């Protein structure tokens, strides 16, 4: 390990990640300059907005996989659980509003997780087989429910829900000009300075019109960290996956 790597490893996490992000944007800037017209949108504000929006399903699936792995359960049925959550979330948002839709969607995904738990832990089914079965059945269940319910409404079909109300969005004040405040990132973007303007453009996309649903999903990351590593429940989850017999010896009913 050389001196620069050692110094980097000693930096706190809050300082390392912005440094990695700035280096990543520098790479995008160089690729954009070399590619010219073919890569002109790499650091555009709309690109980073889309990146943030589309990372949410992957983030939620990753958090679900984290809890499963820590509990000692191989969960490859996450895609099917996400599909169930998506359908129930759309149904809930259409009937009761966006925030009820988020809650009902979480319950729908949890139903898929419960099926996986019953099959693997309760009935002893192989984890892989159970996960594959959920991934196969969930799309067909969603398609059937859509054909029976969503097709009865305008805009609905077997592949999409009727139009639902937005959960609303937030533009950060001072950084992106929210609430009529100055717009720091836009000023950086318009400065026309290599790298600095690209950083401003990317950060402007990350801080402009952020859906409240996205903010809730991002908040689940530190919340999950706290639950798994700072609470009694998290300790029990981790010991169940890492050393079940040690958990049994401490009075945790695992088997």
Model segments located where?
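Membrane-interfacial amphipathic/re-entrant helices at transmembrane-helix boundaries
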Residues: 2-60, 88, 99-100
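Alpha-helical transmembrane segments and their helix-start/interface "positive-inside/aromatic belt" motifs
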Residues: 6-19, 122-133, 255
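Structural signal for membrane-spanning alpha-helices in multi-pass inner-membrane proteins
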Residues: 30, 61-65, 89-93, 117, ...
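Single transmembrane alpha-helix segments in multi-pass membrane proteins
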Residues: 46-102, 111-128
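Transmembrane helix-bundle core of multi-pass membrane transporters
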Residues: 139-229
